[in-house]
Every structure is written in C-alpha cells, then in structure tokens.
C-alpha cells in the first residue's frame, strides 16, 4: 500500500518538476545552521552544459569544510534529515575530480580567517535537468574537511561513504530560482 501511495505521489510530482525545470536554468539553496549561513546558486545553461556552483557561506571556522549535495530536501530533524550524499549511480565517495564519486561530492570549500568561504566551481555530474536533478535535494556544508575518499586505517571505511567531513554545519533545500 505504501509503495502504491509513493508511486502515485511520484507520478503527480515529477511531471510538474520536469515542467518547471524547462522554465528555469537556475536553482538556489539558502543554508542555515546554528552559526553558519549562506546562499548557493547553481546555474546550468542547458542539459548538456556543466553546472556552475557559486555563492558565499559565513560563520565557518577557518579552513576546509566538506561541501556536498545530499539525497533529501528534508530538514525536519535539522540537517541530519538530508540523508546521505546524493548517489544515484551507487558509487563510493570521492573528490570532485575523481572518476569514482557520488554525484553530490563537491569536495571542500575554504573559509578564510573571517569565517567566510566564497565559492565558484563547475561540475559535470551535478544537473538541474532530468531524473538525476539536484533540485529538491539539500546542499550541506560540514564542520570538518572532506578527505575525498582517501582516508586510511580506521578512517578508510567511513571515508568511502562520507569523506569523514564531520558534523553538518548548515544545510538548505535546493529550489528552482527565476531563470537568468
């Protein structure tokens, strides 16, 4: 019964999301945490272009912080409700330039002495279009550095799942924005 309900909801929602995607080439995530805030924009001119991810995050400790797209656009229990990294292809964790990685693996952002991270990167797997869209999922910045799937010893197993990036400092749902 639950699966039937889930199928009905999916069939009702996804055509609307796909129609909306055809009207916009841009999405936004407003990140909120206890002390960390930010705004991240994702722009993709067409389905065949790379996504451009840019924005600013404030309130971080100086240094590197894991930066990912997570599976769910759910914040009912804080950022933990966002679930694992977005991974539609069933890969292990890696860095943004790794051949094997989750779609959501965007590496690290670096906060300066002022606690601000300015972000501008491109990505070939993140997309605003089609069945693997990041729209409706969550953008998360972590308290610690992502080891890009290269952890060793007792950190190796978790490294292949999360990059050992630590607690979730802030998150926000990735929503469609007005076209640019």
From Swiss-Prot:
Q: How is its activity regulated?
A: The insertion of copper which activates the protein requires glutathione. This is independent of copper chaperone for SOD1 (CCS), which activates orthologs.
Q: Where does this chain mainly localize? A: cytoplasm
Q: Which UniProt keywords apply?
A: Antioxidant, Copper, Cytoplasm, Disulfide bond, Metal-binding, Oxidoreductase, Signal, Zinc
Q: Which SUPFAM superfamilies match?
A: Cu,Zn superoxide dismutase-like
Positions binding Cu cation in this chain are 68, 70, 85, 142
Q: Which EC number(s) does the record attach to this protein? A: 1.15.1.1
- Reaction(s) catalysed by this chain's protein: 2 superoxide + 2 H(+) = H2O2 + O2
Give the InterPro entries listed for this entry.
SOD-like_Cu/Zn_dom_sf, SOD_Cu/Zn_/chaperone, SOD_Cu/Zn_BS, SOD_Cu_Zn_dom
Q: What's the protein name? A: Superoxide dismutase [Cu-Zn]
Which branch of life, at top level?
A: Eukaryota
Q: List the signal peptide residues.
A: 1-19
Q: How does it assemble?
A: Homodimer.
Task: Enumerate the subcellular locations listed in this protein's record, separating them with semicolons.
Answer: Cytoplasm
Taking the record's annotation, the residue ranges forming a coiled coil are none
Family label: Belongs to the Cu-Zn superoxide dismutase family.
BP terms from Gene Ontology = regulation of brood size; regulation of vulval development; removal of superoxide radicals; superoxide metabolic process
Q: Where does Zn(2+) bind?
A: 85, 93, 102, 105
Task: Return one GO MF term.
Answer: superoxide dismutase activity
What Pfam families does the annotation carry? Sod_Cu
Q: Which cofactor does it need?
A: Cu cation; Zn(2+)
What are the disulfide bonds?
A: 79-171
Effect of loss of the gene? Worms exhibit increased oxidative stress and reduced brood size. RNAi-mediated knockdown suppresses the slow germline development and the delayed egg-production of clk-1 mutants. RNAi-mediated knockdown causes an increase in the number of oocytes with mpk-1 phosphorylation.
Q: How is the cofactor bound?
A: Binds 1 copper ion per subunit.
Protein function: Protects cells against oxidative stress by converting superoxide radicals to hydrogen peroxide. Required for normal brood size. May be involved in regulating mpk-1 phosphorylation downstream of phosphatase ptp-2 during oocyte maturation.
What is the recorded phenotype of mutating residue 169 to P?
Abolishes enzyme activation but has no effect on disulfide bond formation or dimer formation
């Amino acid at each position: 019964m639950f699966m039937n309900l889930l199928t009905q909801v999916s069939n009702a929602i996804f055509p609307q999301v796909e129609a909306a995607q055809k009207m916009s080439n841009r999405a936004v995530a407003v990140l909120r945490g206890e002390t960390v805030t930010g705004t991240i924009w994702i722009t993709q001119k067409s389905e065949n272009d790379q996504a451009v991810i840019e924005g600013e995050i404030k309130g971080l400790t100086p240094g590197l912080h894991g930066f990912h797209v997570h599976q769910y656009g759910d914040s009912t229990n804080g950022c933990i409700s966002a679930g694992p990294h977005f991974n539609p292809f069933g890969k292990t964790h890696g860095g943004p330039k790794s051949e094997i990685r989750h779609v959501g693996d965007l590496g690290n952002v670096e906060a300066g002495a002022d606690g601000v991270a300015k972000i501008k990167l491109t990505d070939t797997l993140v997309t605003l279009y089609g069945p693997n869209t990041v729209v409706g999922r969550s953008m998360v910045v972590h308290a610690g550095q992502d080891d890009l799937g290269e952890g060793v010893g007792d950190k190796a197993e978790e490294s292949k799942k999360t990059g050992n990036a630590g607690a979730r400092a802030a998150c926000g749902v990735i929503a469609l924005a007005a076209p640019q």
